Amino acid sequence: MASLENLVARYQRCFNDQSLKNSTIELEIRFQHINFLLFKTVYEALVAQEIPSTISHSIRCIKKVHHENHCREKILPSENLYFKKQPLMFFKFSEPASLGCKVSLAIEQPIRKFILDSSVLVRLKNRTTFQISDLWKIELTIVKQLMGSEVSAKLTAFKTLLFDTPEQQTAKNMMTLINPDDEYLYEIEIEYTGKPESLTAADVIKIKNTVLTLISPNHLMLTAYHQAIEFIASHILSSEILLARIKSGKWGLKRLLPQVKSMTKADYMKFYPPVGYYVTDKADGIRGIAVIQDTQIYVVADQLYSLGTTGIEPLKPTILDGEFMPEKKEFYGFDVIMYEGNLLTQQGFEIRIESLNKGIKVLQAFNIKAEMKPFISLTSADPNVLLKNFESVFKKKTRPYAIDGLILVEPGNSYLNTNTFKWKPTWDNTLDFLVRKCPESLNVPEYAPKKGFSLYLLFVGISGELFKKLALNWCPGYTKLFPVTQRNQNYFPVQFQPSDFPLAFLYYHPDTSSFSDIDGKVLEMRCLKREVNHVSWEIVKIREDRQQDLKTGGYFGNDFKTAELTWLNYMDPFSFEELAKGPSGMYFAGAKTGIYRAQTALISFIKQEIIQKISHQSWVIDLGIGKGQDLGRYLDAGIRHLVGIDKDQTALAELIYRKFSHATTRQHKHATNIYVLHQDLAEPAKEISEKVHQIYGFPKEGASSIVSNLFIHYLMKNSQQVENLAVLCHKLLQPGGMVWFTTMLGERVLELLHENRIELNEVWEARENEVVKFAIKRLFKEDILQETGQEIGVLLPFSNGDFYNEYLVNTAFLIKIFKHHGFSLVQMQSFKDWIPEFQTFSKTLYKILTEADKTWTSLFGFICLRKN
């Protein structure tokens, strides 16, 4: 692509080219992304200025010819004359506010008559030409294109619609005579009519801006805004590919900057205690970048805010990241990108922060209302000290703004790779959605109307790659709301469908709400209540500061991952006290030590082998899924839909976190759609079954398989629990569906205790190098295995030396109950039978498998049952 200056120079040379003396030389400016509303806006603006105009009608037949040199010619018969139109050069303005504006240089030459065939494109044109000066004319054209069989079928009808209107066409009545509902194309072109030698590139830019200002009075401001983002990006990004996304407008400010992550308990556990981190308050402002560029001082946020000038002398650039209060024009800096020409993006935050205050002082020197956010460096792991640190920031009364949370900043990483987390009280956790009114007449039961409410659908942004890896589908009505071109992008809107609440994207908006025109807007919303099959949402505010990001076509509210991880704080609330003491209820928080390596590898191998038996099934339910230890195995098996059920909210939150981790770091041949249900499996089977069947898309006939790995001992307290489990499995499975249990075998445990003469409250131990590796504490006195209710204490690899109590599983009784409820036993097998296969799988791990490991593994087995 040529530069604009080169194109203008080539245009001028064409008039001295003797080979072109019989050609018409055209320099045109075309706008490529024109819809009816934009067309009408420009048309009416030109009419209002009473600019001289003429109306013309034409029918042109076009035949496109492609040569070996890839030069395209258009052959155009007009008034029985035949021409070929050959493009020579073009220049395209890159800024998105220019609506794909393109400057084209072409020549038109007369040729001999050619044969019209079915490949010819027929274009009917209704054109109004406005001669805005001696140098330029603006042509606004309504076009109908016909091809092939359409020509004979529709040509006469559209000729009547476009040309033979009931009234004589004038510029003033044109837009009322043409029906915009028909599938017309709309073109705006500017043609140069002045002396070739007088034209400059600046003239082209000026006339282009004139038309764009008719479309949007803020065009020049939008152009300046985009140029400011480009300036910032040039100091942050090194990748030409990413810089091109900024220049094209596909990325706006939000996609450029590193985002603050909503912190979950699982996030916090990874670095608790947060020694070395920096903490500051979170203000309820908008993200903004303060810039000193030459003599200009401005903030780039939802728009461009000019804060003044430095005077005559230009300064070296300073770029600060922070929060901006537009009403008061106050800037609160929390990071620095560049200070007086020194790029700091590769330094750790602990170094960057030293220049942040210096940058703030530069702003203050020019009477800008700016200050550095107050940071505390966390140096102690003592919970009491941490509590005082957090309270001193969060509960401070002297800040000039309302504090709605805390920010934790990780040291040691570059600007783009610095992990920054925000913590908010549950009430202040909000999400940003692109809101669209639900199309009518969809006949979707889940979209049932409610009197006094209008149904809207909530959308967030997602990459095409993540969309595929999470096996998501577009909701009913999606194709009516978003054009095909948008759906084919690398980043597009998707309904907000978290794993634990697939219908969370439904929002019933009260007709009496003070928020009226919300369709197509980005709204900040909070969850008031989670009901059986929908969420009660409350609008906090319309994100007017995000409208410009929305126009880029690359922003649709929060990113899907960000939104779901924020949503976890409704599912598993994170209290202020837990910041100091550490998250409570973390599921099996202890880590396994190296001595368990071979034994845990063996158990993992066995579970992998079992799950592979159900590979590629459509719907699978995991009872007691915990934090998703088997998630990778389900993904490897290509399960299409996985429903995980557990009563531990914190464990389920960790599972969802793992869902995204697998999607971004591991490669799987098949995608799995993951649903989670927070549910105590000891509750009545009927209630649980109803909840599962309410999961969006769950088949009426039931799932293909139910899996429960090392969980059912929790449901062996009494026979009623076992009966309830059997009923639940029957209700959730399709006929012929399978149940797969792995469990510690009660019969084998009792045998081990008898062999070693372990009495009540005594402990059987297996040691390795004088370290207790496995242990079972006998908590019952009966000598024979009871149907239910016999407890033992178990020392687990991840229990940090503590015993976990569980019930012995009487497998004979379990199978008996399942048979009574319509199941047949397919297979029962001890884990020890897999040891030879494990040796083949990994000779290295098998060699370090000890006798204690083998003894412990022999206590476990699996049971497979089929629903009759």
UniProtKB/Swiss-Prot annotation:
GO cellular component, as recorded: virion component
EC number: 3.6.1.74, 2.7.7.50, 2.1.1.56
Subcellular location(s) per record: Virion
Binding of S-adenosyl-L-methionine, residues: K607, G624, D646, L710, F711, I712
Induction (free text): Expressed in the early phase of the viral replicative cycle.
InterPro entries per record: CYTH-like_dom_sf, mRNA_G-N7_MeTrfase_dom, RG7MT1, SAM-dependent_MTases_sf
Domain mRNA cap 0 methyltransferase: residue ranges: 594-868
Single annotated GO MF: mRNA 5'-triphosphate monophosphatase activity
Domain of life: Viruses
Principal location listed in the UniProt entry: virion
CDD domains: AdoMet_MTases
Keywords tagged on the record: GTP-binding, Hydrolase, Methyltransferase, mRNA capping, mRNA processing, Nucleotide-binding, Nucleotidyltransferase, RNA-binding, S-adenosyl-L-methionine, Transferase, Virion
List of catalytic residues: K282 (n6-gmp-lysine intermediate)
Family (UniProt): In the N-terminal section; belongs to the dsDNA virus mRNA guanylyltransferase family.
Subunit and interaction comment: Part of the viral DNA-directed RNA polymerase that consists of 8 polII-like subunits (RPB1, RPB2, RPB3, RPB5, RPB6, RPB7, RPB9, RPB10), a capping enzyme and a termination factor.
Protein name: mRNA-capping enzyme
Organism from which the protein derives: African swine fever virus (isolate Tick/Malawi/Lil 20-1/1983) (ASFV)
